[in-house]
Structures are given as structure tokens and as C-alpha cells.
């Protein structure tokens, strides 16, 4: 049996699929460059540099003896804590494993048939395109205007709406540009279509509260807000995501969502993180402070342009170097940032820099001075 037989069985959309390119890990860089993992600064994956609540370790140890048992498909304690944290009813929440990616995939499995149209403004989170392609949807691209600091061109969204449009993705704050979408523009999109409007709020904790659509989502028939524990809660390795929408949307999605995708350990970590409000608030406060420190430091370099952000990362445009060369120079010195070449709608001279601890930001800025000078 030759490989050609496998080729004949693979779906055409998978053959053509341009896969998602994840950020590099400390372990990968340690192996490649001979640097100790503890000496590497990771500013490439939009993680919480202070990690999860210190109370989580004890709770994981308490749960270890139960991992031979299946988890609860819907954990009532987690739902209660989420409801309290978000100030929305439990019936308006859906929780999944694999971060918000599972919720995105569940949206496609619930609402999108072959050939249906989805609208994706670019540049944005690549997983929307990947999921749309896998589910054989027709992608129509809208845009963020670079000359306006990547403000959403709302007309480009509205002009792409047809009677075949099923889903519209609005990432706010947007990844990788960091900007929010103005409330009036979100509202225009919602009101001018009966398609499902997905408002991705993965980074909303770092933005001004007035831009948060979570509590408003259940009031609409065509809105779902995506949230995650991977960012400010420091649980990227536990893969917990959730959505908030009206009960009808949630009920249909629950029919197709994987049953046991959220592990016992993931559930107990999420519950503990929600209960440690003091640690959460400190991470938000310090994250914003780190972002400001990073932004002010980057603005001093004349050979780069840094864009304002409401997230936990900054988009940087390089004026004299390509992203690949720039990232390589940083990697040699033990610093990971994200090459944005793989993001649709950006060129090969953009990188994304995540927040770090205050010490990490200081060290990064000193290393950057070496490279640019």
C-alpha cells in the first residue's frame, strides 16, 4: 500500500488547508539554541506571565485520585461560579475543552452547512479560517484599516453580508492587532444581519469595561460571546473556554458539543481560579501596567512602529527588518516573540509582543536595543 492511496482518501479541503502556526515553546527554543528553559523569556503566546492562582496546585493534588473516573459533562459548581463571575444565568453559558477553539468548532458544527458563507475581517485569529475551511464554508474577508491603527472597516463587513451568510466573526480586542471594535460598529453588524455574530472576547479582561458584550449577549437572538481561561486566568495548558448566548443558541450547541472534553483537572482549576478573585484582579492590574511599560519602551525606537492595544500584547511593525530575521536575533538571545507573517492580511514585517513580568519587559527592551542599534 502506497501513500498515494491515503492521498485519494483525504478530503480536498484538508489537502488545501494552510494549518495554524502556533507560537514557539520554551522547550523548543531550549533544544534548538542550547539555552536553559528558565533563562528564556516567552513573549509570544499572549499568556499570563504570573501563571495561575497559587491555590490551584493543592486542588489538583486533591483531584488526582479521581482521574480514573469520567468528568461531569456539565459541572454544576463550575456553572454556578461562572454565572456569578459573569452576572449571567447558567442557561446562557456553554463550557468546553481546548479553550475557545472547541466553542468555535461547535458553532460551525451547529450552524454551518457546506457552502454557507462566513465573514472574517482580517488580520485576525487564524482559527476562524481553519475551522471555516474544514467545515467547507465559503469565506468572505472584510478588513481592519491599517491607516487607522487597524480600526474595523465596518462597511467592508456589511457589504459582504448576503442571504447565505451564516456567521460573522468579530474579535475584540482583536488578535493580533490589539484594538477594540467600537460598540456602535458591533451593534450595526448585529442589527443589519440575521447571521450569528461571534464576539470573541478572549482578551476582554484587559480592555475597558464599556466594551464588554458578555452580559448583553443573551438579549440577542444572533449573538454569542467567546471567553477563555487561557489568558488572564493563566490556564492555557488546561484548555478551558466558554460561550455566552441566549438559551436557544446554547441548547442547540449542547447537542453537538463533545460530551467529556473538559477534564476533571481542568474543571477544578477553572473553579479555583474563579474563586480567587484577589489574584485575578492583581493579574489584570499588573497585566495592564506591563502593557503600558512595554508600549512606552517600544515607542522610543524610531525603526519600529508600535500600535495601541487593549489586550495583553502589542503589534509591532518593523521598518528596517523582516519579522523572520528579527525573531531569529531575539531567539539567539533567549527571547520569544510572535512572527505575524502567517496572519492573513499582514506582511512579513510584523511581530506581536506579549506582556511579561516587569523584569522580563525590562530585559526584553535592553536586548531589543542591542539588536536595533
From Swiss-Prot:
The modification N6-(pyridoxal phosphate)lysine is found at residue 231. It comes from the Archaea. Its cofactor is pyridoxal 5'-phosphate. One of its GO terms (biological process) is L-histidine biosynthetic process. InterPro entries: Aminotransferase_I/II_large, HisP_aminotrans, PyrdxlP-dep_Trfase, PyrdxlP-dep_Trfase_major, PyrdxlP-dep_Trfase_small. It is an enzyme of class 2 (transferase). Pathway: Amino-acid biosynthesis; L-histidine biosynthesis; L-histidine from 5-phospho-alpha-D-ribose 1-diphosphate: step 7/9. Keywords: Amino-acid biosynthesis, Aminotransferase, Histidine biosynthesis, Pyridoxal phosphate, Transferase. Its EC number is 2.6.1.9. One of its GO terms (molecular function) is pyridoxal phosphate binding. Pfam families: Aminotran_1_2. The keyword Plastid does not apply. It catalyses: L-histidinol phosphate + 2-oxoglutarate = 3-(imidazol-4-yl)-2-oxopropyl phosphate + L-glutamate. Belongs to the class-II pyridoxal-phosphate-dependent aminotransferase family. Histidinol-phosphate aminotransferase subfamily. This is Histidinol-phosphate aminotransferase. It comes from Methanocaldococcus jannaschii (strain ATCC 43067 / DSM 2661 / JAL-1 / JCM 10045 / NBRC 100440) (Methanococcus jannaschii).
Amino acid at each position: 500500500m502506497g501513500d498515494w492511496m491515503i492521498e485519494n482518501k483525504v478530503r480536498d479541503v484538508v489537502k488545501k488547508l494552510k494549518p495554524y502556526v502556533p507560537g514557539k515553546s520554551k522547550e523548543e527554543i531550549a533544544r534548538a539554541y542550547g539555552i536553559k528553559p528558565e533563562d528564556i523569556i516567552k513573549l509570544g503566546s499572549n499568556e499570563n506571565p504570573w501563571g495561575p492562582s497559587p491555590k490551584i496546585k493543592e486542588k489538583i493534588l486533591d483531584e488526582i485520585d479521581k482521574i480514573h473516573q469520567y468528568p461531569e459533562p456539565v459541572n454544576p459548581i463550575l456553572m454556578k461560579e461562572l454565572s456569578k463571575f459573569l452576572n449571567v444565568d447558567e442557561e446562557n453559558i456553554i463550557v468546553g475543552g481546548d479553550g475557545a477553539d472547541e466553542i468555535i468548532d461547535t458553532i460551525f458544527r451547529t450552524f454551518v452547512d457546506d457552502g454557507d458563507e462566513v465573514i472574517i475581517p482580517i488580520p485576525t485569529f487564524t482559527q476562524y479560517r481553519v475551522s471555516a475551511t474544514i467545515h467547507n464554508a465559503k469565506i468572505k474577508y472584510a478588513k481592519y484599516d491599517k491607516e487607522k491603527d487597524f480600526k474595523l472597516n465596518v462597511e467592508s463587513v456589511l457589504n459582504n453580508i448576503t442571504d447565505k451568510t451564516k456567521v460573522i466573526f468579530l474579535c475584540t480586542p482583536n488578535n493580533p492587532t490589539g484594538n477594540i471594535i467600537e460598540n456602535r460598529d458591533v451593534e450595526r453588524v448585529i442589527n443589519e444581519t440575521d447571521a450569528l455574530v461571534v464576539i470573541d472576547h478572549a482578551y476582554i479582561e484587559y480592555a475597558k469595561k464599556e466594551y464588554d458584550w458578555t452580559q448583553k449577549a443573551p438579549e440577542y437572538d444572533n449573538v454569542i460571546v467567546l471567553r477563555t481561561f487561557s489568558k488572564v486566568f493563566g490556564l492555557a495548558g488546561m484548555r478551558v473556554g466558554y460561550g455566552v448566548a441566549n438559551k436557544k443558541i446554547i441548547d442547540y450547541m449542547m447537542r453537538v458539543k463533545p460530551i467529556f472534553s473538559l477534564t476533571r483537572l481542568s474543571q477544578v482549576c477553572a473553579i479555583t481560579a474563579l474563586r480567587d478573585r484577589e489574584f485575578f484582579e492583581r493579574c489584570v492590574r499588573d497585566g495592564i501596567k506591563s502593557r503600558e511599560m512595554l508600549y512606552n519602551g517600544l515607542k522610543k525606537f524610531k525603526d519600529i512602529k508600535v500600535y495601541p492595544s487593549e489586550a495583553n500584547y502589542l503589534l509591532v511593525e518593523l521598518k528596517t527588518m523582516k519579522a523572520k530575521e528579527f525573531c531569529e536575533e531575539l531567539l539567539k538571545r533567549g527571547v520569544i516573540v510572535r512572527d505575524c507573517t502567517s496572519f492573513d492580511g499582514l506582511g512579513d514585517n510584523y511581530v506581536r509582543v506579549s506582556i511579561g513580568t516587569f523584569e522580563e519587559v525590562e530585559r526584553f527592551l535592553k536586548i531589543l536595543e542591542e539588536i536595533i542599534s
